[in-house]
């Protein structure tokens, strides 16, 4: 699922979805040239860590894909979710993305590429049981 849009500093993306019982759920903010400006990927007992081969468990992986290559991942460990409902918000501030899950600030992520080229927001469940409930842009960013 996706929405096409124009997006700039100070605006927010909100995705509401049921969390996966296993697997992955991701929200991508994508530029018109295909650059993934922000990739937020929640993994609940999914895949395997390169260092151990054991599954990722309750981790949020944040990254960007520039020029066809993924950058260095930033990770937030021990991310608690509920099966029934999750609310992800990625807000653009002046210099960083502010990432919330269930109304809790869990990470900031520095811009790696200009954000005014964003034209699309994508939601993916990687074939797992997460279900998108709502995907929208909020103008302007909600005050905290």
From Swiss-Prot:
Keywords for this protein: Lectin
Domain of life the protein comes from: Eukaryota
Any one Pfam family match given in the protein's UniProt record, by short name: Gal-bind_lectin
Keyword Nucleus: no
InterPro entries on file: ConA-like_dom_sf (IPR013320), Galectin_CRD (IPR001079)
Record keyword Metal-binding present: no
Coiled coil, from the record: none
Domain Galectin positions: 1-138
SUPFAM superfamilies per record: Concanavalin A-like lectins/glucanases
Functional description taken from the UniProt entry: Lectin that binds beta-galactoside and a wide array of complex carbohydrates.
Assembly behavior: Tetramer.
Protein name as catalogued: Galectin a
